[in-house]
Amino acid sequence: MKLNEIQDNPGSSKSRMRVGRGIGSGKGKTCGRGVKGQKARTGVAIKGFEGGQMPLHRRLPKRGFYNPFGLDYNEINLGRLQEAVDAGRIDVAAVVTNESLIASGLISKPRDGVKILGVGELKAKLSFQVAAASKSAVAAIEAAGGSIELLKRAPEAPTASAEA
C-alpha cells in the first residue's frame, strides 16, 4: 500500500445536498427548514444544542453541594508565621489572635477564624488563640515551647419564630 492508494471507507462521507433547486429534488422551496419560525431564519443557533447528540452540560455529572453550615477558615502555615516573626511583623511576647494576624498583614479578612496548619518549621515560642489547628501544628507549637488555645464558636443567635 502506498500513500497514493489510500481511499476513504465506502459510505464514510456523504455528498453535499444542494438545496433550493426545485420541488422535484426533495429539498426545494423551504430547503428542509419547515415553515417560518425562528429555526427557518438565518443566523439562529440554539445554545448548547449539538445536533441531537447529548450535549456536554448533560453528559458531565453533577458534583458537590453548598454546605450552609460549613466554616471558611483563613489557613496559615507555620512557615509563614516564622517568616513574619523573623521580619518583625509578629510580636513574640503578645498572643497571636485573629486581629493581630490582620494587623500584621498575614490575612486580609476575618472570615470564620484562623486555622493553623503544620507546613514549615516554627522556632519562635508563640502563644495562639485561634479557631482551629491541625494535629501536626499543635505538636510543632508545643515542641517550640509555645501554647495554643482553640476558641469555641459562639452559638448562632436564634431567629425570631412566629408565635401566632
From Swiss-Prot:
Q: Which GO terms describe its cellular component?
A: cytosolic large ribosomal subunit
Q: Which UniProt keywords apply?
A: Ribonucleoprotein, Ribosomal protein, RNA-binding, rRNA-binding
Q: Does the keyword Ribosomal protein apply?
A: yes
Where does this protein come from, organism-wise? Methylocella silvestris (strain DSM 15510 / CIP 108128 / LMG 27833 / NCIMB 13906 / BL2)
Q: Where is this region: Disordered?
A: 1-35
Q: Name one GO biological process term.
A: translation
State whether it acts alone or in a complex, and with which partners, per the record.
Part of the 50S ribosomal subunit.
PROSITE patterns, A to Z: RIBOSOMAL_L15
Q: Which Pfam families does the entry link to?
A: Ribosomal_L27A
Q: What is this protein called?
A: Large ribosomal subunit protein uL15
Bias class Polar residues marks the residues at: 1-14
Which intervals carry biased composition (Gly residues)? Answer: 21-35
The UniProt similarity line reads:
Belongs to the universal ribosomal protein uL15 family.
